[in-house]
Regions:
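N-terminal binding-site loop/beta-alpha segment at the start of enzyme catalytic domains
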Residues: 1-76, 80, 108, 142
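Short amphipathic alpha-helices and their capping/turn segments at secondary-structure boundaries
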Residues: 2-7, 56-65, 94-105, 159-166, ...
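Conserved, mostly hydrophobic/aromatic
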Residues: 6, 18, 38, 46, ...
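Active-site mouth loops of central-metabolism enzymes
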Residues: 19-29, 79-95, 124, 235-244
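Acidic-and-aromatic substrate-binding clefts and catalytic sites of carbohydrate-active enzymes
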Residues: 23-29, 47-57, 79-81, 88-89, ...
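Short, acidic/polar
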Residues: 25-38, 89-106, 153-161, 245-253
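Active-site groove signature of glycoside hydrolases
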Residues: 100-124
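Beta/alpha (TIM)-barrel catalytic core signal, keyed to glycine-rich beta->alpha loops juxtaposed to Asp/Glu
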Residues: 118-343
């Protein structure tokens, strides 16, 4: 495993990281097995925005006895209300949710306190102007409960503002070849629209390119989410390029962007961990994404869910992300897989 400096934080992180979002439906033993596989492969950084108490406990128990070897990136703003995830800046909910996170992870600090899901420039402006929420985050840093401040966003304009602010050390940003062709927006639906905007199709959006360069200049580290676009890039039928990319190609694309230190890969099983870590021994030809992109059509990216869960909470209590995931798994097969049918 190769390790990279995370901006100016002084942290060295494995270039393959663990995204914890798919651990929520697994047992204690299964979650522990994923962390065992990560240790075996040299992975030392985990990102988790999950608010559900049970999965926080499972991750914390899996980290017990190895906390000092792991860089933990935990999110501030996800809360658990009435059995559902709710993202809020209301300190009445945020403060107990953060204390709960530390307690369940069996630690008294997070290496990175990630301000969760900031996609609107006006919201970031309010935070940077000293909102109560941001004052709380800064207090956590001054007290040592978080060592570095991060922001997660899908919007390059927000990421650029964060990098320029001097307040943010790390940005968690969605990076893959498809998303790089889309314009910055606070409307996430554009990332899954039927077509790319014509003036950015086939080339990296200039705003995203500027943001990557600015982060490299300012020493702001980038962690990557959605490198696989929810698995859509692995199938020619769902890829905007009309041809499938491999996990290795997607990882290489993300890791060759300026300022990127690590890609957070969502892993259900040890096999997923090993598949991601195989990047480290892949040949240059295996990593070559350029040949696929060179033949990419200019338009027609069919809109699809990437199961991020940001549409929550559902008024009817439905786990929309998981319903969409299993629907898509079924639709890609001639018959409904047994594993989906049994759910």
């Amino acid at each position: 495993m190769k390790y990279r400096e995370l901006g100016s934080t002084g942290l060295r992180v494995s270039e393959i990281g663990l995204g914890g979002e798919w651990l929520q439906r697994h047992t204690d033993a299964e979650v522990c097995a994923v962390f065992d596989a990560c240790d075996e492969c040299g992975i030392n950084v985990v990102d988790s925005w999950l608010a559900a108490p049970d999965v926080r406990t499972r991750i914390g128990d899996a980290l017990r006895g190895r906390r000092d070897r792991w860089v933990i990136e935990g999110h501030i703003a996800p809360t658990w209300q009435n059995g559902q995830y709710v993202c809020t800046r209301d300190l009445k909910y945020v403060e107990p949710a953060f204390r709960d996170l530390l307690d369940r992870l069996h630690t008294d600090f997070l290496d990175i306190g990630m301000v969760h899901y900031v996609d609107r420039p006006d919201e970031l402006t309010e935070m940077l102007n000293g909102s109560p929420f941001m004052r709380y985050v800064q207090k956590l840093k001054s007290c040592g409960n978080i060592r570095h401040i991060g922001i997660s966003t899908h919007n390059a304009a927000v990421a650029q503002m964060a990098a320029q602010s001097g307040e943010v050390d790390v940005i968690l940003f969605s990076i893959n070849p498809a998303f790089d062709m889309l314009p910055p927006s606070e409307d996430m639906s554009l990332y899954f629209a039927d077509e790319y905007r014509s003036d950015v199709s086939g080339q990296i959006d200039p705003a995203r390119a500027r943001m990557y360069a600015l982060c490299a200049q300012r020493g702001v580290g980038i962690h990557v989410m959605k490198a696989y676009a929810g698995g859509r890039l692995f199938d020619a039928r769902t890829s905007p390029f009309g041809a499938a990319l491999t996990p290795v190609q997607c990882l290489h694309y993300a890791l060759t962007r300026p300022a990127v230190a690590s890609v957070m890969v969502g892993c259900d099983t040890p096999a997923h961990v090993y598949a991601a870590a195989a990047y480290e021994t892949a040949s240059e030809s295996d990593k070559d994404y350029a040949s696929v992109l060179a033949a990419a059509p200019k338009h027609a990216y069919g809109g699809q869910c990437t199961y991020c869960g940001h549409c929550a909470p559902c008024p009817a209590g439905i786990d929309v992300a998981m319903v969409n995931k299993f629907t898509d798994l079924a639709a890609l097969q001639p018959e409904v897989p047994d594993g989906v049918r049994s759910l």
